[in-house]
Amino acid sequence: MSLIQKIIGRFLPRQRVIARFNAASRSPESLRNFQGSDFLSADAAMSRSIRKLIASRARNEFVNNSYANGIVTTLADDTVGRGPRLQIEGGEETEAYSRREKRFHKWAKAVKLNELLRCARIAKALDGETFIRLQLNPNAPREVKLEPRIYEAEYVESSTLAETPLEYYDSGEPVEIDGIFYDQYGNPTQYRFWRLHPGSPLGGATTAFTMDDARNVIHYGNFYRAGQHRGISEMAPALNIFNDLRRYSTAVVLSAEVAARLSFIISNDLPAEMMEGTVEVDENGQIAKTALDIRGPISLSSGDFNGLVLPAGYKTSQMKAEQPTQQYCSFKDAKIAEAARVFSMPFNVAAGNSSAYNYASGRLDHQVYHKKLLIERDEIATVILDRIYEAWQAFDAAKHLEDYPSTDESHYWMWDGFEHVDPVKEANAQALRLANGVTTLAEECAREGRDYQTILRQRAREIQDCEEKGLPPMPWMNVQQPVVLPEKED
């Protein structure tokens, strides 16, 4: 640009650039698309009636839609697996730790802890939340009488009909949110439980309830908004998708049934003027005379052959079954993938079909799903398992004080590992990590859900047995460089 153009350009009117957010448009189309948007708080948006309505629809979809049932059940099975195993770390008192771990494992099997965790995971997906009460069972034939018991969300409700909190502290925290009482700092203090489920035959006729201290109640739910106190169903965004899937499947089946029930269709290609005035009707409304032979078809039979004789100008044809079979499969797969995205579940797991997958694509899809499972396992360990272990430990220490020599200890929960789609690649990577010293045997075993101490003890027994029986040592017993097997291309 020349100097003269720059000088002249200063005196010319400048063109304004108009920019805006399309999402903030107030056009009729945008208002229709976002007609459900509001500024409600988390508790107001997730009121009791809203939560119960969504939960009831999610449960209905779960028991009537095989894909919804399979997705949620698979999610719970993959999350819990065979159940978490307690691992205690601390000083040198390994034998004492081992005895405690065995007692807890035995107690967990007796109270069906794994079943409780799977039920809790399903409840979070369908209902949005669940409650676990740490109560005692004096009649239980075991040393520790503690027995956690799970309750549906409807058990914890307010005695009033108010949908939103009526009282607040000066700090802004609510006094009660639908059966959960809080202090001025937002900590739950008490839970109000109905004696009977509100949906049971006598639940609506009773007003009996119990107040449980917060120390004895575990609240596990789906929380994603600031200030949210009650959980909302994880399936809420996918309910319409599952419903569309059922409706479309039903429509395709009905279309096929209609086509199968119609044996033939009779039609004619006569001009309209030939059909006018060709029928005379008597005083009783009965056909008296016809100019054209439009009587019904006459059936003929000759031996094993059957046929029809049609009136003049008429023809017959079979109804073509034109159900969208190819479109149905594509539509179904798209809906399943869309619904499973709520749980970060890959399509092949949700649909139970990996025909379109190879090792590379399967591994990439599963990485996201496995991260989701790891995050959920960590939440279960923090919210549920640590609380249960703390309560169990109080009873166990009273009877086995000798197994609690040190207070400087910690614990973690070991879960089932994830199987690799290519075992050779994973074994090579594991061997290189161990050889380079960037990992430990404990970490590698933890990835597979195994205890490295159990493996070392088994190795010691195998070495001793080989020496006693005069057998040559196994390949892994010889000190050598790690063997890396050749990898195959995908």
What are these regions (language model features)?
Residues 1-86:
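N-terminal-proximal low-complexity accessory segments that begin disordered
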Residues 131-153, 271-296, 387-418, 478-490:
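Charge-rich, acidic-biased intrinsically disordered regions
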Residues 63-223, 433:
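Structured, mid-chain assembly/scaffold modules that mediate subunit interfaces
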